[in-house]
Amino acid sequence: MSEALLDLQPELGLVLRCHPGQLEFAGNYLRRFLARVELTPFVSQFQIAFDEANWCIDNALTRQSVLRWIAELPQTAVGEQVRLPAGIRAVISDIVPEAFAVAKQAGLPGIGVSNYTWYEVAAGFCGPGEIEPLRTMYEQADLLLNYELSTGAAIPIRSKIPAGLICRPFNDSRIAEIRIRYKQPERSLIFLSVGGALSLERIGLCADFDYLYTRGINPPAGITAHLIAPEATDTQNYLAACDAVITKCGWSTVAEALLADKPLFVVKSANGWAEEQAILSRLRDWRAAVEIEAGQLPCLNCQALVPQQLRFENNCKTVASQILQRAGFG
């Protein structure tokens, strides 16, 4: 999205606040715009506690994390207000609640861009009264550009505009280059992205496939698997070069798989949170994915590689144009 905003508006500058672990990636990806981009660290204290051994959420630990985070939000918002640079024309968030409190206080447009908010997620672990401060912060947003695979009506932002799906642009020549390098005759090439929470050494993988995988995964012995370099800024092209995608239920990779027209396997957690449940529900409606448990990974077969029946459009430029219009750029 940042790339699309900067491409569409040559006069635009961005102050991009993101997790310290994302700063290097953001700098590399946006390197042709660095004269117009300021990168600064931001750490959200919200955390879903995941039980790796059982591939499920630890509800008690997550509840503690949510309550601690909500208690700290007012002070965090004050700190963000102090850090707000001069000359800002809009605050965009995906989907940090403090951003909207800061925008409201500064008299700026507060624009959300997401398929969910942390309010719906927190509601799965805490009572309505406990998360009311979170609702109040989100209600200060002026607008949500609401992606598909959404938690929908449960989102506490009143003004919503459907935004479809977006991802970074695909590059056909780069996709062909990756496929020539890794695709072997008579073998399916699978994009594997399940984060660091799943121990594949313990669970195993189907040896009938070859894999391109992202960091945080330890593939078991006897599997042909190639690590995508951690510094790669075009993982969407690696995904598009593969014959199918195996991923946990995260929005970005699911959206990329749908937009790249790839057969999709979604690995479910044992007790999914609100965003995961919303994504799975919509994928079921579309018949766009095969749902699997982590333990089924060694048993996948090529017969399950069903082509996508629906076609999706990358709305990245449209969403960027809507943001720029709200920010007063034409």
Segments from the language model and where they lie:
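Donor-nucleotide binding loops and adjacent catalytic segments primarily
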Residues: 2-7, 168, 173-244
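Conserved nucleotide-sugar phosphate-binding/catalytic loop shared by glycosyltransferases and other
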Residues: 6-73
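Short, polar loop motifs at secondary-structure junctions
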Residues: 18-24, 94-98, 147-152, 195-198, ...
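A donor-sugar binding/catalytic signature common to diverse glycosyltransferases
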Residues: 90-97, 102, 112, 234-278
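A nucleotide-sugar donor-handling region in carbohydrate enzymes
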Residues: 121-198
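Nucleotide-sugar donor-binding patch of glycosyltransferase catalytic domains
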Residues: 128, 229, 263-302
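C-terminal amphipathic helix plus adjacent low-complexity
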Residues: 300-330
